[in-house]
Amino acid sequence: MMTEQVVYLNGQFVPLSQASVSVLDRGFIFGDGIYEVIPVYQRKMFRPQQHLERLTRSLASVGIDNIYSNEQWLQIIANLMEKSEGSDLLVYIQVTRGVAKRAHAFPLNTKPTVFIMVNAMSGPSKEMRERGVACVTMQDMRWLHCDIKSTSLLGNVLAAQNAAQHSALETIQFRDGFLTEASSSNVWIVKNQTLLGPQKNNLVLEGIRYGLFEELCAKHEIPFEMRAIAQDEVFSADEVLLSSATKEILP
């Protein structure tokens, strides 16, 4: 008999069925929160410090207190992983501004709601890695702070649904004729043996694999450049790649 999944909520490890938050939590009312996702391979977290640094940046950018140090986050996650089954896992962290009377402006003296869960991660199939995946395109209609890993993801949800309705894995988005990113992935192109990626700015979320791509290209002497990439360049690319915590790197 399988034991019930255990999650972390506001300082307590509790069964998932017993975890609950107020309906007045600003994450529920406004999507006023930040999240982070850390992949785990063979029970070892992938670049945890970089993920936690991004969490810290996103929290600071919207004025939500980060109530834990990186060391405390890592200890909580390690404790939760001990209560979780499996070898390859996905750690989901969510921090909202907390519970307050409904009003748009930031409330005073609220305590952030902290939620963490660990789920099994299967990763892309061998066929997906070898044959590639289907993508569709659309105009990027999201807000102008996509560099913040916000829980307000309706634009991303609509883009993902657009892909699902066309039997594709992802929707690659363009803003004003230039590549931004997919619904939940960064997008890269290969042209003339050079790896190209969009510039790091407010229109894209800087995936943790940005740094990995830079390191691998430097190590293997592969030309690498980050710049504005026109839509026509994507359609004429020698190869298009997706990268994310769950998709890893996919053609």
Located regions from the model:
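Glycine- and Gly-Pro-enriched alpha-helical subdomains that act as flexible
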Residues: F178-K200, E206
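Conserved alpha/beta cores of soluble small-molecule-handling proteins
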Residues: M1-T171, R175-F178, N201, Y210, ...
